[in-house]
């Protein structure tokens, strides 16, 4: 009721004009459908329950500005509206509109303090072993082809195939005759695909057939004699696909397997939540991002800032944990958006620094003007190379200063500098601007003022807990990353208006 009384709704039909064609018969109000979708996540309702609430609950009718005798609509309309939301980033547009209303009401403003954290999200699929994955992919493809063009399976599917693929695969981690099953299932998958492409020329195959093709390639390969073999981690040149590409279920090919440490592992996605945390105002969710489970947190930060800039809600200070901090992104946020990213910067990665003995990188004096490095014993480097780009998009470019064997071999403290007997010491460091930023941030992190400011970040973990356990965000309602993102956006709007 507060949303209707104070904001006159979060959106109006004109906000959705670009989503619909100009001709055709009139449809249901998209503003009302969007409101119902949000109320679903406020109260944890299914589509049927939400449609029933629209029909008979007066508070729903008031929130949607409906007449009391309005009969509502069929529950399947909500699924159709979500399909429309999944197109072209429209879910983010829905959040933009809601935040614009809150900003106009003075509930959220630009250049305050915001904080971000992430959590894991479980896909709406069950965990499968690799053998179960291939078996289930064959079964799903057979079901899809049988429904679309069943005559193509004539002469291929027999009683033995019916016994193998008639029911969902539940083989466990230690099935009987595993090697026989692996080869038989792989050969069945290859035969099925060859049969379909031979007899279904020109036909556009559905998602399950395409998923089977990818799963077959990721789990099998053919040797020089043309035999189909099972991929293992030890195969030279024929190993397993990386987790960022490996499909874990034929029913959701966007879900990925990830592991954090030795405790948390899951198949699904990651959700990144950003909220305001100014002491003189309410906490408002300003951004939600849904990524593959294997996407590193630091790669999400530029996208968060770009969306906040579009909404006119960039923070002055952005509190994040160590997963989001990198020299490149700290410098980029300050340069492009005038945002101070506050979070623990990773320490010096050299072996000497980790062990707390010997000469680490910080013990060398770097002279950028003269392009030389002086070691603790007074020797001056003889080479200055780079900056070189690094393989990681989150790592800073690297300059390498090299010393010679003539300098290092007679050094009395060589053992404290390098363990190599065949080469001299090399020192790597980022360019001057990033190096100055690195030293300044590491110094600030040790001050009580910085620690007091950063302590506010921990509050976002309570918001994550509310999302995950209070609104069921831990488990996907829908399949596919786009639909999962819709769930996260609707949950964010629901949390904002509660």
Feature-to-residue mapping (PLM):
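Basic, low-complexity segments
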Residues: 1-23
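A short secondary-structure junction motif
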Residues: 10-14, 57, 61, 470
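Trp/Phe/Arg-rich N-terminal binding region typifying the photolyase-homology
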Residues: 17-30, 43-94
């Amino acid at each position: 009721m507060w949303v209707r009384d104070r904001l006159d709704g979060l959106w109006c039909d004109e906000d959705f004009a670009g989503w619909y064609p100009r001709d055709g018969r009139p449809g249901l109000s998209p503003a009302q459908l969007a409101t119902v979708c949000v109320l679903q996540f406020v109260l944890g309702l299914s589509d049927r329950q939400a449609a029933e609430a629209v029909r008979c609950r007066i508070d729903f009718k008031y929130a949607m500005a409906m007449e009391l005798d309005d009969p509502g609509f069929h529950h399947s309309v909500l699924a159709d509206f979500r399909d429309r939301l999944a197109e072209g980033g429209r879910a983010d547009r829905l959040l933009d509109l809601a935040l614009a209303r809150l900003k106009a009401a003075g509930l959220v403003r630009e250049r305050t303090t915001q904080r971000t954290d992430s959590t894991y999200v479980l896909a709406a699929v069950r965990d499968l072993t690799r053998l179960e994955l291939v078996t289930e992919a064959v079964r799903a493809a057979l079901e899809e082809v049988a429904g679309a063009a069943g005559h193509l399976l004539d002469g291929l599917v027999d009683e033995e195939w019916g016994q193998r693929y008639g029911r969902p695969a539940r083989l466990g981690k230690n099935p009987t005759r595993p090697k026989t099953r692996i080869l038989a299932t792989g050969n069945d998958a290859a035969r099925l695909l060859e049969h379909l492409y031979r007899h279904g020329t020109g036909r556009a195959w559905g998602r399950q057939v395409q998923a089977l093709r990818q799963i077959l390639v990721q789990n099998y390969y053919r040797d020089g004699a043309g035999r189909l073999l099972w991929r293992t981690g030890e195969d030279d040149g024929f190993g397993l696909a990386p987790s960022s590409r490996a499909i874990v279920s034929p029913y959701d090919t966007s879900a990925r397997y990830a592991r954090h440490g030795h405790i948390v592992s899951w198949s699904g996605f990651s959700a990144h939540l950003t909220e305001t945390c100014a002491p003189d105002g309410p906490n408002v969710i300003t951004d939600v991002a849904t990524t593959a489970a294997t996407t590193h947190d630091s790669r999400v930060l530029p996208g968060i800032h770009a969306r906040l800039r579009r909404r006119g809600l960039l923070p002055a200070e952005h509190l994040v944990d160590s997963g989001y901090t990198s020299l490149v992104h700290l410098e980029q946020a300050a340069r492009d958006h005038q945002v101070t990213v506050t979070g623990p910067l990773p320490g010096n990665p050299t072996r000497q620094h980790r062990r707390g003995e010997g000469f680490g990188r910080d013990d060398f004096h770097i002279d950028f003007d003269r392009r030389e490095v002086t070691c603790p014993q007074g020797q001056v480097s003889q080479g200055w190379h780079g900056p070189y780009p690094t393989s990681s998009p989150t790592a800073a470019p690297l300059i390498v200063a090299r010393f010679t064997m003539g300098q290092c071999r007679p050094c009395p403290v060589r053992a404290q500098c390098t363990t190599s007997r065949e080469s001299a010491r090399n020192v790597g460091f980022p360019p001057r601007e990033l190096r100055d930023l690195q030293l300044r941030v590491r110094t600030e992190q040790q001050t009580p003022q910085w620690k007091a400011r950063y302590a506010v970040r921990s509050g976002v973990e309570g918001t994550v807990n509310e999302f995950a356990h209070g609104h069921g965000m831990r488990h996907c309602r829908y399949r596919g990353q786009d639909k999962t993102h819709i769930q996260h956006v609707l949950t964010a709007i629901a949390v904002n208006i509660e």
